[in-house]
Amino acid sequence: YRQALVMSAVVCGIAAYHYFRIFDSFNAAFVTEAQGGRGMYEQAAGHSFNEGYRYVDWLLTVPLLLAELIVVLALARKLQTSLLVRLIPASALMIALGYPGEISSDTFTRNVWGLLSTIPFLYILYVLFVELTKSLDRQPPAVRKTVSNMRLLLFASWGVYPIAYLIPIYFGD
């Protein structure tokens, strides 16, 4: 589990850095006149919120999280390599394809890039739910249950992102 722990620490470090940057970007981009933190935030003159920090964070951490998941399963080296070679590029592609839509104010453009980024997302789910299942037949029931729970948690948590991506398109900012 040493590799997984190292990857986990790297993910936490990358995320901490980027979320501090996101916090700073938000503080520079938005102001409120209210006392005690209550009131509406408005765009600060001459500043904009940098969406790039979040996407760079995801571009680095999502492939690492998927690699960590595969490494911790202690699968046969050939299967592990096969899964990593498919999951890591798909996750990077998913994030990279979502960014142009995220920064666009045009609904059509957001929809196109959102749809394009959903294709690698569905592929990742396919690999985790179909391809990984084939290798679990030889595992004890407890391992199969743990992996099944992990996949459902991943689907539930990552499944929020396409919904959150679509909300500004159909319901406004």
Where are the model-predicted features located?
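Membrane-helix boundary/juxtamembrane motif in polytopic membrane proteins
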Residues: 81-86, 111, 132-159
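Membrane-interface helix caps and helix-loop-helix hairpins in membrane proteins
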Residues: 76-77, 100-115, 122
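Hydrophobic alpha-helical transmembrane segments in multi-pass integral membrane proteins
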Residues: 97-102, 155-171
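Internal transmembrane alpha-helix with an interfacial aromatic "cap," most often the third helix
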Residues: 55-87, 99-103
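Hydrophobic alpha-helical transmembrane segments of multi-pass membrane proteins
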Residues: 4-24, 161-162, 166
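Alpha-helical transmembrane segments in multipass membrane proteins, preferentially the mid-helix core
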Residues: 68, 97, 120-142, 148, ...
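Hydrophobic alpha-helical transmembrane segments of polytopic
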Residues: 4-11, 57, 83, 87-90, ...
